[in-house]
Amino acid sequence: MSQPIYKRILLKLSGEALQGDEGFGIDPSILDRMALEIKGLLGLGVEVGVVLGGGNLFRGAKLAKAGMNRVVGDHMGMLATVMNGLAMRDALHRANVNAKLMSAFQLNGICDTYNWSEAIKMLCEKRVVIFSAGTGSPFFTTDSAACLRGIEIEADVVLKATKVDGVYDCDPVKNPNAVLYHKLSYAEVIEKELQVMDLAAFTLARDHNMPIRVFNMSKTGALRNVILGKTEGTLICD
């Protein structure tokens, strides 16, 4: 059997990835499939941290444009990621996977408050750790949270799960002739103005030499292929 090329990963799942074709909320079948794919990684000996977005439930930035205070909107968005985290933890438990949900701010009785040393300890015990509530501060995206937590837990890579096969030279949804990149440097991403993630998140990863791999989570087996070093998605590193 092939061996994994990563020992510890940070998996970033967008809220949109959880909603499937529903357009809103959480598709239980997708949640269960993701839980089983994560379980498969544990079987390979990989330690898994997860950061979830909240865009399937709430988008603070969008309402801020309509007049809502941005801080209030972002706080609501953080709570949406906690809701997704609760759903993911439940799906993992139903798949007989030991998982812990942590929040960047206190939510006593619902989940644990984020603690770096405790997170490391649980990862070493082969428990899946779900990091919710973003960074705990407004004005930062969940991509920033993913890169931050990935750096903190000393992950080998941040895996950004999307609905497309990787990073393209233009929008593949609008242009069927878009070209998929298999490997890019941080400098190339900035030079070509490719939309991998927001600049704050991307520069954080770059400054700490944290590799990023963008791949299509909707493809069954894609996550496992990434872990086994097969050609899947786009790798961004120096």
Curated annotation (Swiss-Prot):
Chain positions recorded as ATP binding sites: 12-15, 55, 59, 162, 168, 171
Entry superkingdom: Bacteria
Positions of region (Involved in allosteric activation by GTP): 20-25
Subcellular location: Cytoplasm
Pathway(s): Pyrimidine metabolism; CTP biosynthesis via de novo pathway; UDP from UMP (UMPK route): step 1/1
Regulation: Allosterically activated by GTP. Inhibited by UTP.
Binding site for UMP: 54, 74, 135-142
UniProt EC number: 2.7.4.22
Reaction(s) the record says it catalyses: UMP + ATP = UDP + ADP
Gene Ontology terms: cellular component: cytosol
One Pfam family this sequence matches: AA_kinase
Subunit structure: Homohexamer.
Name under which the protein is recorded: Uridylate kinase
Species in which this protein is naturally found: Histophilus somni (strain 129Pt) (Haemophilus somnus)
